[in-house]
């Protein structure tokens, strides 16, 4: 290999010289760190799907005498977090140590408190004993700013249940502070940060959990746990599970069957009457819901379970829960389709059934916020299908009368007329191209679909069909909307999309007394 030399004396390769190309970070077979150097918060490269990806260590643990690490892959969804062994770690690349976060505000407050103490000691106003039982207000606080003991600022309420900086609480406090109204977690990072189970066997399905669920700690030592798909009871060994199954006689959820068609059934269960079963359901669902942590206080909720029937019995496909008395008008608290039944259309059936119940109650409803990412996608798809079908068929009276006779009956009983009422309500004119068809109000759409006006306007805006033209709102049925409608109708005709039949619902809205709604602790 011939090498030349330039005028400055630096060796330069000739044109026929081979040049080695490497990464900025030189890789070698020599280990740059050991297992003992790995701490919580550090970042390293981990083998995932045949390639090395940057991951953060969230926790380490001794499992059956071997050290395992819980990692979060950078720029990937949290549900891909997993426990790994040391043989999947690339020890030839440098370990990235965690950065220590310094809160500047705390430093400033600490500095001010020190200076104030010094000034007080010089003036002789402070003794040796600490008498600061009430915190002094910050000098930088503007007049009128509420203190800890002042009334709550209603404009700054965290209505979505999201965690704010400085509001972190421990896992024990989180469990103690579970809400008696709703099902939101109050602390995402501590409770659901580390997944504690590796594999779940539910009936004939092997499912990999996504998130943490507070199952008994002895089960977390097992490679897999077994769950009965009828009682939802959990076991750490196959022998225990098989022995239980030989004695188990339950073939369906322990509630009232309120709906059945050729494909699915729905069961209503009172959380107060079936505490054990509902708690087992919440434990199972918490494995796949990141932002919910309700698993113990089931008394304030009704559970609606969707099942499919086989020769063995009715198997749980998914469920949703709702508060017996919701101050916010929610018709769904938690909603979940089990992963082994996802991408089969069951999620939309659950959503459709929740609105079917709202229709019987003569109420509008909306799911409790915030929704999970998959839940939000399912709701948006359902809202889109519902509004596209309604608006297109409303623009074509023949299709509307043919496919929605029950909606016409409901609209007639509620408004005494299908035509929009005069002035005073927000209305929109439906147009198809340049041909105006009919008027419809947002309130009427809400009355027909049982969706809230907020969800309706959100969906219309997302579809980009709500316009303002010549002093009035119009809904433009575009070619894209017509294509969506044709695709939807084709799915229904080809029986690729299952629709629930309201006439097969046998249900009366439950009524509860004040004593029944009083939560016993």
Curated annotation (Swiss-Prot):
Subcellular localization: Nucleus; Chromosome
Domain Tudor-knot: 39-90
Motif ESA1-RPD3 motif, residue range(s) on this chain: 275-296
EC numbers for this chain: 2.3.1.48, 2.3.1.-
Keyword Nucleus applies: yes
Gene3D superfamilies: 2.30.30.140, 3.40.630.30, N-acetyl transferase-like, Winged helix-like DNA-binding domain superfamily/Winged helix DNA-binding domain
Residues bearing the modification N6-acetyllysine: 292
Zinc finger map (C2HC MYST-type): 225-250
Segments of skewed composition (Low complexity): 124-133
Active site residues according to the UniProt entry: 368
GO MF term list: chromatin binding; histone crotonyltransferase activity; histone H4 acetyltransferase activity; peptide 2-hydroxyisobutyryltransferase activity; transcription coregulator activity
Record-annotated disulphide pairs: none
Pfam families with a match to the protein in the record: MOZ_SAS, Tudor-knot, zf-MYST
Catalytic activity: L-lysyl-[histone] + acetyl-CoA = N(6)-acetyl-L-lysyl-[histone] + CoA + H(+); L-lysyl-[protein] + acetyl-CoA = N(6)-acetyl-L-lysyl-[protein] + CoA + H(+); 2-hydroxyisobutanoyl-CoA + L-lysyl-[protein] = N(6)-(2-hydroxyisobutanoyl)-L-lysyl-[protein] + CoA + H(+); (2E)-butenoyl-CoA + L-lysyl-[protein] = N(6)-(2E)-butenoyl-L-lysyl-[protein] + CoA + H(+)
Positions bound to acetyl-CoA: 333-337, 342-348, 372
Main localization of the protein described in the UniProt heading: nucleus
Amino acid composition bias (Basic and acidic residues), ranges on this chain: 101-113
Domain of life: Eukaryota
Entry's Gene Ontology BP terms: DNA repair; DNA-templated transcription elongation; positive regulation of macroautophagy; positive regulation of transcription elongation by RNA polymerase II; positive regulation of triglyceride biosynthetic process; rDNA heterochromatin formation; regulation of cell cycle
Site-annotated residues for Important for catalytic activity: 334
Post-translational modification: Autoacetylation at Lys-292 is required for proper function.
Family: Belongs to the MYST (SAS/MOZ) family.
Record remark: domains: The ESA1-RPD3 motif is common to ESA1 and RPD3 and is required for ESA1 histone acetyl-transferase (HAT) activity and RPD3 histone deacetylase (HDAC) activity.
Subunit: Component of the NuA4 histone acetyltransferase complex.
Name of the protein in question: Histone acetyltransferase ESA1
Species for this entry: Debaryomyces hansenii (strain ATCC 36239 / CBS 767 / BCRC 21394 / JCM 1990 / NBRC 0083 / IGC 2968)
